């Protein structure tokens, strides 16, 4: 990382890091921390805030690994949703009628792409020990023995249910969807708790209302819509992303906006609120005029957003595509090994 006074980033696992006893690169040094990543990252954030120069403003980027694949909950949350049945998306069994090849030829379906070992965790300890090259074992072995014991107990019922062999067709897809959601949302629980910890700390030191807090993500995510998990497509479920900004001194609580915003807007927004001149060559636009006006969209605000995904062939086999989205319509061009267009109406959304 460039330009930071202090940094601590996860390493390993395709540079995503591990959930249990994770490795970090911290200011150029490799360290291993004991515990659960979501908790540890928050500990580090609070430690940084405690040690900062109290006479200067601060900017801190607090990023979590969770809930990245393969959705491994904190030990305290293992199995917490095992008796919960989540509502299925209306298009969980999407047949992609009216869409082109891209939707049909992806490799990110709950039915076919979720793996029994890495994603669904359908391996016993004995089976992992027989094949220690298994990817699930590579993270399982990082757990303390008491966490392994709890893991085994929690997932034993899932493994037994699957191995009865009664699940076929749509029933199997529905079953996989439930396991996916149980692990995904159990993993998110620790994020919720730790954001609360951080906000409580800011309140404790008297800085909560003096700090601009931005809650966002790098993209949306498919949670069963179209029968998928993951992201990449320009469809609404993953093109739309959360963006919540709290700053009571200037932003009215509860105000919302339909203004089209993009991640390139973050930097000019931060500069604007900090009273720093925005460089003329910056691509985004400050969201401050929207935020301080109770979400009302300025007359000269952008009318469309551009999107481009080009990592094909790559994991999940999502075709290369670019497109434009307005408030009412979306036009997508899939290219490279295909040449197809999709136009979608958003008016009903």
Question: Which residue ranges define each predicted feature?
Answer:
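Conserved small/polar residues in nucleotide/adenosyl-binding loops
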Residues: 347-349
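Hydrophobic "lid"/C-terminal helical patch
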Residues: 45, 49, 270
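C-terminal cap/loop subdomain of S1 sulfatases and analogous C-terminal strand-loop tails that border
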Residues: 3-14, 70, 219-225, 264-267, ...
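FAD-dinucleotide binding site
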Residues: 1-2, 38, 42, 46, ...
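A short local loop/turn or secondary-structure capping micro-motif enriched for an aromatic residue
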Residues: 41-42, 232, 339-342
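Active-site-proximal cap/lid insertion segments
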Residues: 11-35, 50-55, 61-210, 214-261, ...
């Amino acid at each position: 990382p460039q330009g930071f006074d202090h940094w601590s980033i996860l390493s390993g696992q395709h540079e995503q890091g591990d959930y249990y006893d994770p490795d970090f690169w911290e200011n150029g040094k490799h360290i291993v921390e004991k515990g659960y990543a979501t908790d540890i990252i928050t500990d580090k954030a609070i430690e940084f805030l405690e040690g900062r120069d109290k006479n200067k403003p601060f900017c801190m980027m607090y990023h979590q690994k969770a809930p990245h694949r393969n959705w491994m909950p904190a030990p305290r949350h293992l199995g917490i949703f095992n008796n919960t049945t989540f509502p299925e998306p209306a298009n969980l069994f999407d047949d992609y009628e009216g869409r082109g090849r891209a939707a049909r030829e992806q490799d990110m379906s709950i039915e076919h792409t979720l793996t029994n070992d890495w994603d669904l965790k359908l391996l016993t300890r004995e089976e992992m020990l027989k094949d220690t090259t298994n990817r699930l074992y590579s993270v399982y072995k990082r757990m303390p023995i008491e966490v392994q014991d709890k893991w085994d107990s929690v997932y034993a019922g899932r493994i037994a249910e699957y191995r009865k062999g009664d699940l076929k067709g749509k029933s199997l897809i529905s079953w996989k969807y439930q396991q996916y959601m149980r692990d995904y949302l159990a993993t998110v629980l620790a994020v919720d708790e730790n954001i609360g910890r951080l906000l409580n700390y800011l309140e404790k030191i008297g800085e909560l209302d003096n700090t601009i807090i931005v809650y966002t993500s790098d993209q949306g995510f498919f949670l069963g819509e179209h029968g998928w998990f993951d992201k990449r497509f320009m469809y609404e479920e993953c093109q739309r992303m959360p963006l919540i900004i709290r700053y009571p001194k200037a932003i009215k609580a509860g105000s919302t906006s339909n203004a089209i915003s993009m991640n390139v807007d973050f930097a000019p927004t931060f500069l604007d609120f900090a009273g720093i001149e925005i460089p003329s060559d910056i691509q985004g636009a400050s969201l401050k005029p929207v935020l301080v006006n109770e979400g009302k969209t300025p007359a000269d605000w952008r009318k469309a957003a551009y999107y481009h995904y080009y990592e094909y062939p790559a994991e999940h086999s999502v075709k290369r595509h670019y497109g434009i989205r307005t408030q009412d319509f979306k036009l997508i061009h899939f290219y490279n090994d295909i040449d197809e267009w999709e136009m979608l109406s958003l008016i009903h959304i």
